């Protein structure tokens, strides 16, 4: 995505109206809406490309939220492909026991990413900053993907 597309997608995702985004950027609502559509098309293609590269079967795609739910038949688990304007595209595999991961550097990076994504998506994480990042991932992704826990 271009920088303008990232900006428009991010501002609209933060809950601002097209008119407010247009005013903030010094442009028109028509420009904002066209840019949003172009951004969502590029984001859809990028999420699908990431899913294909990771051998995932796509179950759900929501470019407005920057998320794709997939399934990896080889390892028999769900996977979530996410997009963040700050961190780009990431692939997350859905494990039943995320607390088993103990690598401190990886867990720190994961926590930063998840907290940033929760902030971008307006997901409340009050009191969640001290829980294991694997559990935090389950909570954040469950907010973004209906029915993920099943």
Language model feature labels by segment:
Residues 1-6:
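Short helix-coil-helix linker/hinge
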Residues 9-16:
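Short helix-to-turn junction characteristic of helix-turn-helix DNA-binding domains
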Residues 17-28:
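Short alpha-helical "recognition helix" segments of helix-turn-helix
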Residues 43-59:
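Short Lys/Arg-enriched helix C-cap and helix-to-coil transition segments
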Residues 56-130:
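Helix-turn-helix/homeodomain-like alpha-helical modules used for DNA recognition
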Residues 122-150:
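Non-catalytic terminal/accessory regions
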């Amino acid at each position: 995505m271009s920088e303008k597309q990232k900006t428009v997608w991010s501002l609209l995702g933060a809950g601002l109206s097209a008119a407010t985004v247009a005013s903030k950027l010094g442009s028109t609502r028509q420009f904002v809406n066209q840019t949003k559509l172009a951004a969502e098309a590029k984001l859809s293609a990028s999420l699908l490309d990431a899913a294909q590269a990771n051998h995932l079967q796509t179950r759900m795609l929501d470019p407005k939220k920057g998320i794709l739910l997939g399934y990896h038949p080889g390892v028999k688990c769900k996977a979530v492909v996410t997009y963040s304007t700050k961190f780009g595209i990431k692939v997350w595999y859905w494990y039943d026991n995320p607390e088993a991961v103990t690598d401190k550097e990886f867990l720190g990076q994961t926590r930063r990413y998840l907290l940033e994504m929760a902030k971008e998506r307006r997901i409340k994480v009050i009191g969640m900053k001290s829980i294991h990042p694997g559990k935090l991932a389950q909570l954040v992704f469950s907010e973004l993907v209906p029915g993920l826990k099943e």
